């Protein structure tokens, strides 16, 4: 299990902090009404000592093959009595429920996202003024300009264990709105995505993986965004520090795809150009008007500010097969790499505080 105390999102350390945003959420059904419509699931959950995934409006079950049962949790972790159970929402939407007493990015409360599974097996909705899922700011669009396949943008779960479990699949030649939080979101935090190579499925990409393939937490690129109270959207793209680690078998391998930020109205955007194009950039290089910056773990990145509610795009594109700058070979994301494999294992740990 990934602990928020130990795995701070790399972009959260570098993205600009913002103020407070006020929004009016649409009325949401009471928890009792929803439980009645899922009575069979509810009774089964009580007998098993867990709360079953409820499929409330906008919620998306993820990685359903594990003990998590669709909740946005580690595959070995159940939504058990007395625990908080985070969940994924549809693309462009944010989780609207979390522990009201968890107001800062500190362990262990930074994991208390989602619904509370009480001692009777009932799911409690803590924030009655918010829907289970609600629309983000809608100011960042993921565009897939690659011809080599669909692209999985995998959002980390926060508040939660920060694994990249929340899927947004962008078909070749299409686009999807990404979830952009305002300052009304938990602890005024931003959204964080791992951007996978075209052709890697959501099932393979949006889970904690291993060094056998450059996907999931080993994907080459990360991205993030949030909006402040002045309608400024901050959008970041950068290299994934895990991809650059000395133990990573492809740390010197240039990806077969690139990523860049563009704006529909460039007059409203500051920080352009902001791109990573492996046909001209080496590993851990970015092209930026400000020269780029280096974040936690040594991953270089660039940030664009879209003002006055303007929209920005995170575009994924193919790199020409002849790319060979700086002598680093290009990686086909579906290549089989013969190497020593490092695999991240999950282990859920219960911490008991002494009184």
Curated annotation (Swiss-Prot):
Gene Ontology, cellular component aspect: fungal-type vacuole; membrane
Protein keywords: Membrane, Transmembrane, Transmembrane helix
Keyword DNA-binding listed: no
The name this protein goes by in its record: Uncharacterized protein YMR244W
Record InterPro entries: Beta-glucosidase/SUN-like (IPR053088), SUN (IPR005556)
Bilayer topology term: Single-pass membrane protein
Subcellular location, record wording: Membrane
KW DNA damage (keyword) present: no
Pfam families, sorted: SUN (PF03856)
Family: Belongs to the SUN family.
Phylogenetic lineage: Eukaryota, Fungi, Dikarya, Ascomycota, Saccharomycotina
Primary site of residence: membrane
Membrane spanning stretches: 6-26
């Amino acid at each position: 299990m990934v602990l928020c105390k130990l795995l701070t999102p790399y972009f959260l350390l570098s993205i600009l902090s913002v103020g407070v945003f006020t929004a009016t959420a649409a009325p949401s059904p009471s928890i009792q009404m929803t439980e009645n419509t899922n009575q069979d699931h509810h009774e089964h959950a009580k007998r098993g000592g867990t709360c079953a995934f409820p499929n409330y409006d906008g919620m998306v079950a993820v990685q359903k093959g594990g003990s998590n049962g669709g909740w946005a949790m580690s595959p070995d972790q159940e939504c058990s009595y007395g625990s908080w159970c985070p969940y994924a929402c549809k693309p462009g939407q944010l989780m609207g429920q979390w522990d009201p007493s968890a107001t800062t990015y500190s362990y262990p409360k930074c994991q208390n996202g989602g619904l509370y599974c009480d001692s009777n097996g009932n799911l409690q909705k803590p924030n009655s003024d918010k829907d289970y899922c609600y629309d983000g700011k809608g100011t960042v669009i993921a565009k897939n300009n690659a011809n080599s396949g669909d692209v999985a943008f995998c959002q980390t779960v926060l508040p939660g264990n920060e694994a990249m479990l929340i899927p947004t699949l962008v078909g070749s030649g299409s686009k999807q709105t990404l979830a952009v939080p305002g300052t009304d979101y938990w602890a005024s935090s931003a959204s964080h995505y791992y951007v996978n190579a075209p052709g890697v499925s959501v099932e393979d990409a949006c889970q904690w993986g291993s060094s056998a393939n450059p996907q999931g937490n080993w994907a080459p690129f990360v991205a993030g965004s949030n909006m402040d109270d002045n309608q400024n959207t901050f959008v970041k793209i950068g290299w994934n520090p895990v991809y650059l680690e000395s133990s990573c078998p492809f740390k010197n391998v240039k990806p077969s795809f690139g990523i860049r930020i563009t704006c529909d109205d460039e007059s409203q955007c500051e920080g352009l150009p902001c791109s990573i194009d492996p046909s001209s950039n080496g590993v851990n290089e970015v092209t930026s008007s400000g020269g780029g910056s280096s974040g936690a773990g040594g991953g270089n990145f660039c940030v664009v500010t879209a003002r006055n509610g303007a929209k920005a795009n995170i575009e994924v594109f193919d790199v020409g097969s002849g790319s060979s700058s700086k002598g680093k070979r290009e990686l086909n994301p579906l290549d089989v790499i013969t190497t020593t494999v490092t695999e991240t294992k999950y282990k859920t740990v219960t911490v008991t505080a002494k009184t």
